[in-house]
Swiss-Prot record:
Name listed for the protein in its UniProt record: Caspase-1
Gene field: Dcp-1
GO molecular function: BIR domain binding; cysteine-type endopeptidase activity
Family statement: Belongs to the peptidase C14A family.
Organism: Drosophila melanogaster (Fruit fly)
GO annotation, cellular component aspect: cytoplasm; cytosol; mitochondrial matrix; neuronal cell body; neuronal ribonucleoprotein granule
Swiss-Prot/TrEMBL keywords: Apoptosis, Hydrolase, Protease, Thiol protease, Zymogen
Function according to Swiss-Prot or TrEMBL: Involved in the activation cascade of caspases responsible for apoptosis execution. Proteolytically cleaves poly(ADP-ribose) polymerase (PARP). Loss of zygotic DCP-1 function causes larval lethality and melanotic tumors.
Propeptide regions on this chain: 1-33, 203-215
Keyword Protease: yes
Top-level lineage group: Eukaryota
Keyword Hydrolase attributed: yes
Catalytic residues, chain numbering: 154, 196
Length: 323
């Protein structure tokens, strides 16, 4: 259903005279591609760029060395995982999501196996979702590796549905930016979204086999964007349906759960999510013979990553689940 403005002169990637890359050096002032903005109109972490800010406004603990290739996943706790499971709605046009409880229960177990402290919230109104998210953002995540949030609901392009109304995902994830939740700064914040993003169908295409087959120095501190280290994994691409079996759960969630259980401690997360894509793309096809237009349709998940390092869950000692 569903002209340029000048920024501060921070830059990276220039070459020193000997040809080595000096990743921490400054270059001349950069320009944005935004139209008609002025420094006074820019919003930085909830305040205009021209507004005076406290000296420690955007200072947080460094969880890993500046150019580390992997996230630090050896904190005392894995972290908090929130699951928002929507089956019934107050909105007349939205049908109940039979089969979603299978997804929620099995995803909870998969998260727990990775060491997360999991809480499941069923059929929440938007105000309750924001309440739970706000409470999670207020926690001290200093001793946590990361954060995970899963939303299982109806959706359309750009929107998700709570029990009583629609909302945008950024209403949720902005709570966990470095501005509002500094103890998660520099740590992975993972969002898994099972919902339609439109009403288009993917009929797929049949493939036939042819004749032939063809490091820099560490520093004591560094600055990161407040929106860094997020990952959003969606069950389908923008504009398209997302499929769910009323007995077995949704294609995407079941594929995600199987990969987390089988390879969650073996592969890095982006590799794992690539194989989630593979499972959904190859192992599923809609079975709606009574409605030919809907029958034998396909689906492909997609993701948006602002991660800045490799993420591997690895083993977490028992008893260290609490976030």
């Amino acid at each position: 259903m569903t002209d340029e403005c000048v920024t501060r002169n921070y830059g990276v990637g220039i070459r020193s005279p000997n040809g080595s890359e000096n990743r921490g050096s400054f270059i001349m002032a950069d320009n944005t591609d935004a139209k008609g903005c002025t420094p006074e109109s820019l919003v930085v972490g909830g305040a205009t760029a021209a507004s005076p800010l406290p000296a420690n406004k955007f200072v947080a603990r460094m969880p890993v060395e500046r150019y580390a290739s992997e996230y630090n996943m050896s904190h005392k706790h894995r972290g908090v995982a929130l699951i928002f499971n929507h089956e019934f709605f107050d909105i007349p046009s939205l049908k109940s999501r039979t089969g979603t409880n299978v997804d929620a229960q099995e995803l909870k177990k998969a998260f727990e196996n990775l060491g997360f402290a999991v809480s499941v919230h069923k059929d929440c109104k938007l105000r309750d979702i924001l309440k739970h998210v706000g409470k999670a953002a207020e926690l001290d995540h200093t001793d946590n590796d990361c954060l995970a949030v899963a939303i299982l609901s109806h959706g359309e392009h750009g929107y998700l549905y709570a029990k009583d109304t629609q909302y945008k995902l950024d209403n949720i994830w902005h709570y966990f930016t470095a501005t509002f939740c500094p103890s998660l700064a520099g740590k992975p914040k993972l969002f898994f979204i099972q919902a339609c993003q439109g009403d288009r169908l993917d009929g797929g295409i049949t493939l036939e086999k042819g004749v032939t087959e063809t490091d820099g120095e560490s520093s004591t501190s560094y600055k990161i964007p407040i929106h860094a280290d997020f990952l959003f994994s969606y069950s389908t691409i923008p504009g398209y349906f997302s499929w769910r079996n009323i007995n077995n759960g949704s294609w995407y969630m079941q594929s995600l759960i199987r990969e987390l259980n089988a390879n969650g401690k073996k592969y890095d997360l982006l590799t794992l999510l690539t194989f989630v894509n593979q499972r959904v793309a190859l192992d599923f096809e809609s079975n709606v013979p009574a409605t030919p237009m809907m029958d034998r349709q396909k689906q492909i998940p997609c993701l948006t990553s602002m991660l800045t390092r490799i993420l591997r869950f690895g083993d977490k000692p028992n008893g260290n689940k609490a976030g």
